[in-house]
Regions:
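Extended, charged low-complexity regulatory segments
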Residues: 1-168, 653-656
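A general structural signal for short secondary-structure junctions and capping/turn motifs
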Residues: 46-51, 58-61, 102-104, 111-113, ...
Length: 656
């Protein structure tokens, strides 16, 4: 199998070398050569990414047919069956979905773990009820091994251990909007990223136009950044809303004004700001020609009717006015020439046109049919001159000024609703909305969009997403129990209906693979408060009972450092996280907390996971933001093994 793999890689490398050496004469040939080189280089990257753990499974059918399952497909022309089946292919479906109740024609599902190119471990599941034979290796579930493994600070693929409810969503044929609701640890992010890889494989539009993965923050995107490349997919863009808009916010918006700026009413308000700068009233006067409000209104309607962004529509407006002025100048020129002819004829008794024609005939020239004084007016030259005339440009600018997105947003808040200082995170979708009004749709759109932590998006951020996915092919994953302070929607229907109507499929993940029974039990009352109608996830693992320390305010930092040092000594090599109110991160960083653990502000903890988590001052986290209870819920569910909370109260230290 690896022999064929090496052969294919060598072939692609040779093709790339030949393309790069090929001469290219002219821009078109250079473009085509570069395009071919980029395609081949991407193919090489896909092969390289798939080499590690290339094969991870095998299915043995009851009729004896065996298929190996891996990160990519390999086919030899002389063989009827593929050497390796891509995990996204239909033939791989039984590997993920077969059960003892419905074995889907399989006798055995085999999990393989490679060390380099050598099989390091084998585990078999007998699915048809038959007895295990000497060829079967039955042990702990590969999922159990993965769940018990230490965290690394980066998410890995779950391509070998996707569970049936997850896999069904990943492979859903629905090309519209797929929504995945699930509590902490249910694998929402895993589903989202593997869904992106599947979309590239199965949906031609996604493969042609690419996939966008939108995450809540840069920390989260760094955490998941290696998943898709390790699945062999490089045609995926990972971004935050800020990166999509090309804006770097430098201040944090207060919660209440963030909710206002996130509301859909702001879209109409921004559109009105632009509309008021599109020749709502006024006349246009250049070169002695005056166009009244009626003519200007016709020009405005023609420009607006194109559906172009304000600045491109401005050129249509300008050209329409210039055409009207050119027509007026031509009429004036004709009237002037006719008046001169009439005055000369009256004074001399001569018809100048007839006299000129007679003279031309005497000289041997033929009279041009239909010639007149109007033929001497070069309308196209006049039109071009007007388009380049600074006076015309100034007159157009007064009626239909060139705009920037920044100017539109600042004009919206000129009444004092918001400070006009540096941009905040809540300003980003407003700037993007304004950019679409001013310059038209974004330059880059995608065939499929995946949004993680989608419950975080405001109405204005949803508009950002939809603009970049004209086909409305999206996978959205989240949990409204973890929603932040700017979110006003209470459920998926409320969030999505304005953009896609009822055209979305809702799936619910019910099993928590990351969080233990004991940890989920500590969050049950909190979940009831923040999401009364939401059913708790069911954990499949048991672990340590969470501990609580109670300390005085003056002793909280020292207690935290002592706890981290103790955990570090008892569990060397494991990944520790400290989650605290955002306002305390600077102080704790200065105290040296990052020597022992990752320091995470509560507002940034969504989507992350650690072996052990220490939540510092739960009451402080609750009080820090409007969504404080939800932030605390997120923080308490980040651990895969151990949870410790340090409560800060006036009483002396206790431990439970």
């Amino acid at each position: 199998m690896y022999g064929l793999f090496d052969e294919r890689v060598a072939q692609v490398r040779a093709q790339l070398a030949a393309v790069l050496k090929a001469p290219a004469d002219g821009g078109r040939e250079v473009y085509e050569r570069d395009l071919a080189a980029a395609r081949l280089a991407g193919e090489i990257r896909r092969y390289e990414a798939a080499e590690s753990g290339m094969v991870f499974g095998r299915t043995d059918a009851a009729d004896g047919t065996a298929l190996h399952i891996g990160r990519l497909g390999l086919h030899a022309e002389e063989l009827e069956l593929p050497l390796l089946v891509d995990w996204r292919a239909e033939a791989a479906r039984p590997f993920y979905e077969a059960t003892a109740v419905d074995p889907m024609g399989l006798r055995r599902r085999r999990h393989l773990r490679l060390e380099g190119r050598t099989v390091g471990a084998v585990n078999d599941e007998i699915l048809d009820g038959s007895e295990a034979t000497a060829d079967d290796v039955v042990g702990d579930s590969p999922l159990t091994e993965v769940l018990q493994a230490r965290r690394t600070g980066r998410m890995g693929t779950a391509v070998a251990t996707l569970q049936a409810e997850q896999h069904a969503i990943v492979r859903s044929p629905h090309r519209g909007v797929t929504v995945v609701q699930g509590g902490p640890g249910t694998g929402k992010t895993v589903v989202a990223l593997h869904r992106a890889a599947y979309a590239l494989y199965a949906f031609p539009r996604a493969a042609e136009r690419g996939v966008l993965v939108l995450g809540p923050n840069a920390r989260f995107l760094d955490y998941v950044s290696q998943v898709l490349p390790s699945l062999g997919e490089n045609d995926v863009v990972l971004a935050t809303c800020e990166e999509l808009a090309g804006v770097v916010p430098t201040v944090t918006e207060p919660a209440e004004s963030a909710r206002i700026k996130g509301s859909s009413e702001l879209a109409d308000a921004l559109a009105e700001v632009v509309r008021q700068r599109q020749a709502v009233r006024g006349e246009f006067a250049v070169q002695g020609v005056r166009l009244g409000e009626r003519e200007v209104g016709r020009a405005r309607d023609a420009a607006v009717g194109t559906g172009l962004g304000h600045n491109r529509a401005r050129q249509v407006f300008k050209e329409y006015l210039v055409d009207l002025v050119t027509d007026a100048l031509e009429r004036d020129a004709l009237e002037t020439l006719e008046r001169i002819d009439a005055e000369v004829a009256e004074a001399t008794g001569l018809d100048l046109d007839r006299a000129a024609a007679a003279d031309l005939r005497k000289l041997g020239f033929e009279e041009a049919a239909g010639s007149s004084a109007a033929d001497e007016f070069d309308a196209e030259a006049v039109r071009e001159g007007l388009l380049e005339d600074p006076q015309v440009e100034r007159a157009v600018e007064e009626l239909w000024p060139t705009l920037t997105a920044e100017a539109v947003v600042r004009a919206l808040f000129a009444s004092g609703v918001s400070q006009l200082g540096p941009w905040s995170d809540a300003d980003v979708p407003l700037l993007d909305e304004a950019a679409s009004l001013v310059d038209g749709p974004p330059a880059r759109t995608y065939g499929h969009v995946v949004v993680d932590e989608a419950q975080e998006l405001t109405a204005m951020q949803w508009r950002m997403v939809v603009r970049r996915c004209p086909a409305r092919s999206m996978t959205l994953v989240g949990d409204f129990a973890q929603a932040g302070p700017a979110t006003t929607a209470r459920d998926w229907g409320e969030a999505l209906t304005p953009h896609v109507g009822a055209r979305f499929e809702l799936h619910t993940l019910t099993v928590s693979y990351r969080t233990t029974v004991e940890i989920l039990a500590t969050t049950r009352d909190l979940l009831t408060r923040i999401a009364p109608g939401q059913k708790p996830s069911s954990a499949i693992r048991r672990g340590e009972v969470p501990r609580t320390l109670t300390v005085t305010p003056d002793g909280s930092t020292a207690a935290l450092l002592a706890e981290l040092q103790d955990q570090h000594a008892q569990h060397p090599g494991e990944l520790l996280g400290v989650i605290c109110a955002d306002t305390r991160t600077e102080e704790l960083h200065a105290a040296g907390v990052t020597r022992w653990a990752h320091l995470i502000p509560a507002s940034q903890a969504r989507g992350l996971e650690f072996d052990g988590v220490v939540v510092l001052d739960p009451e402080g986290i609750e009080a820090a933001r409007v969504s404080g209870e939800r932030d605390l819920y997120v923080g308490l569910t980040r651990a895969t093994k151990r949870l410790c909370t340090i409560a800060v109260r006036q009483r002396s230290s206790e431990s439970t």
